[in-house]
Amino acid sequence: IGVLNSRHKATGEIFPHAIEAMTTLNAAAATAAVAAGARCATDITGFGLLGHLMKLARASGVSAVLDAAAIPYLDGARQALAGGYVSGGTRRNLDWVRPHLAASVDEDELLLLADAQTSGGLLVAGEIPGAPVIGELLPRGEKLITIS
């Protein structure tokens, strides 16, 4: 959502699917997470997925492994990134997380994962029926986050 918002600010383009995603409350997802016994959760906002995941892992004393191919993106996010619509906050997020990160993905993928969000959904530790599984939490390792 962040790169699409940056593109909107620069071009005036409207992205209805991004607006819909931002205005859809996380209530149903939160209810499902609680019902499924989620261990912890956070909403993905200004720190992006990587920043919020790093904070979650650090506070919980664990490390996280992300499967980059399993992470869903809104249509147009990669095109907005390719067009250079990246906020300074996204770059600062990545700079902040990078020392705690082991990644085998390219810089563009890292920027999307660090994308500063207005409303990026919930990151939940637990098994939620119907929710995408993007990784797992493991005992604390050398790095807080590993991306493959």
Regions found by a protein language model. Give the residues of each.
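Short, acidic (Asp/Glu-rich) active-site segment that either coordinates a divalent metal cofactor
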Residues: 1-34
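Glycine-/charge-enriched secondary-structure boundary and capping motifs
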Residues: 35-148
